[in-house]
Regions:
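Solvent-exposed, amphipathic alpha-helical segments
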Residues: 54-72, 112-126
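Extracellularly exposed regions in secreted/surface proteins, prominently low-complexity, repeat-rich
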Residues: 121-155
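Short extracytoplasmic/periplasmic juxtamembrane "stem" segments immediately C-terminal to an N-terminal membrane anchor
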Residues: 31-48
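Hydrophobic single-pass membrane-targeting/anchoring helices
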Residues: 1-33
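Alpha-helical rod/repeat scaffolding segments in eukaryotic adaptors/tethers
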Residues: 41, 74-81, 129-136
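Extracytoplasmic/periplasmic mature domains of Sec-exported, cell-envelope-associated bacterial proteins
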Residues: 39, 109-112, 142
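Alpha-helical segments in soluble extracytoplasmic regions
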Residues: 46, 50, 58-103, 140-154
Length: 155
């Protein structure tokens, strides 16, 4: 009988101890969320200039690839196509890296550049997967619209 009382008492004490261990205390609050970073107008201006320069470089590379015409030679056509896929893929990563490196980029510009990077990735995969023209045309139209928006913001 004493054993049962001892085991019961230990179980009750253990339960209370475990409950107290997990009970939040007034001083045990989660830390407050960090405040959004603030940037000076100079930092924002420099970030915008750098991201716009990155966009111009990628846009130029993609335009060069699209303007090449090497006749009817199938090997030349495939070479140009592979170069275009690489320009889209590396361009999307370059733009994403530019945004990471420039946290002071204005939010509307950052959002547009992210969208363009996503469209470039989609186009690269669609071209490699030989997706139908209507799907590619839709992505190309989105690319044109977003590019025009970025160019207005960078002007």
């Amino acid at each position: 009988m004493k054993r049962i009382l001892l085991v019961t008492a230990l179980a009750v004490i253990g339960g209370i101890a475990i409950g107290a261990w997990f009970r939040p205390t007034p001083g045990n609050k989660p830390p407050p969320a960090p405040a959004a970073p603030t940037f000076t107008s100079q930092e924002v201006s420099e970030a915008k200039a750098n991201v716009c320069a990155a966009y111009q470089k990628v846009h130029h590379a993609n335009e060069l690839g699209r303007s090449l015409y090497l006749g009817d030679d199938q090997v030349a056509k495939q070479t140009v196509a592979v170069g275009g896929w690489l320009a889209l893929d590396s361009g999307s990563r370059y733009l994403t890296t530019a945004l990471v490196d420039e946290p002071a980029t204005p939010p509307d510009l950052a959002q547009a550049v992210r969208k363009l990077a996503n469209v470039y990735q989609l186009l690269a995969v669609d071209y490699m997967a030989d997706v139908s023209h209507p799907e590619i045309d839709s992505a190309r139209q989105t690319e044109k619209t977003v590019s025009a928006s970025i160019e207005r913001m960078c002007a």
